[in-house]
Amino acid sequence: MANSGLILLVMFMIHVTTVHNVPLPSTAPSIITQLSDITTSIIEEDAFGLTTPTTGLLTPVSENDSDDDGDDITTIQTTTSSSQTVISGVVVEEGVHESNVEILKAHLEKFGYTPPGSTFGEANLNYTSAILDFQEHGGINQTGILDADTAELLSTPRCGVPDVLPFVTSSITWSRNQPVTYSFGALTSDLNQNDVKDEIRRAFRVWDDVSGLSFREVPDTTSVDIRIKFGSYDHGDGISFDGRGGVLAHAFLPRNGDAHFDDSETWTEGTRSGTNLFQVAAHEFGHSLGLYHSTVRSALMYPYYQGYVPNFRLDNDDIAGIRSLYGSNSGSGTTTTTRRPTTTRATTTRRTTTTRATTTRATTTTTTSPSRPSPPRRACSGSFDAVVRDSSNRIYALTGPYFWQLDQPSPSWGLVSNRFGFGLPQNIDASFQRGVVTYFFSECYYYYQTSTQRNFPRIPVNRKWVGLPCNIDAVYRSSRGPTYFFKDSFVYKFNSNNRLQRRTRISSLFNDVPSALHDGVEAVVRADRNYIHFYRDGRYYRMTDYGRQFVNFPNGLPYSDVIESVIPQCRGRSLSYESEGCSNSSE
């Protein structure tokens, strides 16, 4: 009865807040958290077909974030007015055509407001919270329902980069010590080719004029930071355009920076007809430099196209964002050159991707052939930043900007950005898989992805795992349900409802922990049904999943060598990050 009373209390508080616009008391979040502990129910299938059931009354959203999202959709349905209806879990204002419901759902998923693959039970997904976020980001009245203003916003052409709330800038940037390079690939035929290039150059100057950056145009055959090209529908990066209208363009964050423009649009200059190339390009280059979308409607980084602006000027919001990353203008200016850059990328400390002038990010070779080149030395350090088994049972080891696919007789390698798409930083700290979702951790944020999604919502770790520190070292999820996060010599155990149960030393929680792991681990992964692998200093150790007992390998040793046993292609090529230097400019 006590639990029933708590449920009724919270439902009443939500009803009052929703209908009468009365703010919840300060104690409400803790009460709602307690309710989610009592009522959350989920049965997830892990990578090996095992299930971990718990009992309860309410079902969370598919990404398992609903306990932070406010009202449950079943409560919303009971409080709609006579001028509203509920269609497939979405509250719809009278006069808005029901066809907009599916458009809204697709939009919310595509741009990061709801988890991917949202074909779960309609009551599982809190569309009201997602709509409120969407309306806030679009700068329209926040009602939480599909009203006329929301339907109009859905039909407005926009940028294809997901909306990441509420953050303004990326944690990954270009260096200010040398120009950011750009080159031209395929261009639109809507304008004279020289005019296209002039509009692009003008778009770069927008950011050059107010920041500590400079830009250099280089031939398309050279190593380049930002490659500009036009294409239609499937244009080679795995993120297809949608024809005229809808998504106009998209760009990749540093250190992949490329900007792609939908050639199905009619690109124009200096006119209100068509789509203004200069303004869209300047917006996309904001992403290429590390800016996310802005909620300020007058800002260039507002996600929706607002038409041609004759006397365009950057908004103060845009200026503040770019200067927070790169400082103010030093007067270096944007230059154009037809010569190869004199600074070779491999001899600098610049945190960018490797040479990819003639490759496409979405195309990753995942098999090893006799003609495949030797792996880069940096990929052969023997140490991994993270190791993850994804929802398709593929195991990837991440090391700097590279990955190794380990679930093959002869492991293959490639760039992390090629395999996982844009929106995921390359400085990954840890990763694990739960059900259909793969989680990635970097600094104080987590990102998630499924097999059908390439975009990555960026969320503070403490929104989901309260009490978890930033910059974790490793993580794995037990087949029994708990998730173990590692930070220095400590391990944080969270239950299946993502509540912290215990913080203790690694040597205290597991049995017969090798002394080499007492001070911390580099990566952890559930390798198969029986064993968890722990990586540290070029070696890996194994522990039984159910008994949490470290055991020796058949040769009697407590560890196995990573290069000898896991990535033999690296024999003779091992090189630590610190000593990599500029040994091979092609890498």
Curated annotation (Swiss-Prot):
EC number: 3.4.24.12
Cofactor section: Zn(2+)
Reactions that this protein is recorded to catalyse: Hydrolysis of proteins of the fertilization envelope and dimethylcasein
Any one of the GO BP annotations: proteolysis
Any GO CC annotation of this UniProt entry: extracellular matrix
Residues bound to Zn(2+): 159, 283, 287, 293
Cofactor note: Binds 1 zinc ion per subunit.
Residue interval(s) of motif Cysteine switch: 157-164
Signal peptide segment: 1-18
Annotated S-S bridges: 380-582
GO molecular function, one term: zinc ion binding
SUPFAM superfamilies per the UniProt record, alphabetical: Hemopexin-like domain, Metalloproteases ('zincins'), catalytic domain, PGBD-like
Keywords tagged on the record: Autocatalytic cleavage, Calcium, Disulfide bond, Glycoprotein, Hydrolase, Metal-binding, Metalloprotease, Protease, Repeat, Signal, Zinc, Zymogen
Active-site residues from the entry: 284
Family label: Belongs to the peptidase M10A family.
Notes on the domains: There are two distinct domains in this protein; the catalytic N-terminal, and the C-terminal which is involved in substrate specificity.
Composition-biased stretches (Low complexity): 334-371
Name assigned to this protein: Hatching enzyme
Function statement: Allows the sea urchin to digest the protective envelope derived from the egg extracellular matrix; thus allowing the sea urchin to swim freely.
InterPro entries: Hemopexin-like_dom, Hemopexin-like_dom_sf, Hemopexin-like_repeat, M10A_MMP, MetalloPept_cat_dom_sf, Pept_M10_metallopeptidase, Pept_M10A, Pept_M10A_Zn_BS
